[in-house]
Amino acid sequence: MKVFSRRVALLGLCAAGLAACSPQKAAFKGIDITGAEYARQLSLPDTSGKPRVLNEFKGKVVVVFFGFTQCPDVCPTTLAEIAEVKSKLGADGDKVQPILVTVDPERDTPEILSAYAASFGRDVVALRGTLEQTRAAAKEFKVFFAKVPGKTEGSYTMDHTAGSYVFDAQGRIRLFIRHGGGVEAMASDLKQLIAGA
């Protein structure tokens, strides 16, 4: 019995030693979705009609947000936070690429979407596909969106997933950041990814 106990104890010590030697996993504030089987590709036209794909942004940490220009709160808050994070990161802010995908291509014309995106930074890439293309992109990212009738005839708003998807500089999906997490938490996560976490 004593030999068995010693072996178990020795095995436990070996396991603890190996765990101590292995590299520390990054302590993200957002939800770590590294290796997810979704959000692996994005291919939509920008506001000039040029096809854009995620791979062209390799070398940067990419933050993808699905929203719309007439969104009263979540969208402008999220985009303003991303802009603030970029500023807070100083020179490293240039290593962050924000992408806005409209879920309301009906009202978000290229001109309106382009002006809206630019109000949160000249480097924000705004993507606008057909409704079918938008649905396909949303499905790939497991993003929900739906038109909700407004209070007046013909008016509507959009319900949509309120969070951002973050890719590392190698183009791998890494994080889902919920709306309302705050600038400090997002800055911490993006800083770790820029550093190669």
Which residue stretches match the model-derived regions?
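Hydrophobic "lid"/C-terminal helical patch
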Residues: L13, L190
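Short loop/turn microsegments at loop-to-beta-strand junctions
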Residues: A39-R40, V62, T161-G163
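Short active-site neighborhood of thiol/selenol oxidoreductases, capturing the structured segment around
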Residues: N55-V74
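Structural microenvironment flanking redox-active thiols in thiol-disulfide oxidoreductases
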Residues: T77-A137
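Thiol/disulfide oxidoreductase modules built on the thioredoxin-like
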Residues: Q133-D189
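N-terminal export leaders
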Residues: R6-L10
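C-terminal motif of bacterial Sec signal peptides marking the signal peptidase cleavage site
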Residues: A19-A20
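N-terminal "domain-start" segment that seeds a small globular fold
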Residues: Q24-N55, A80
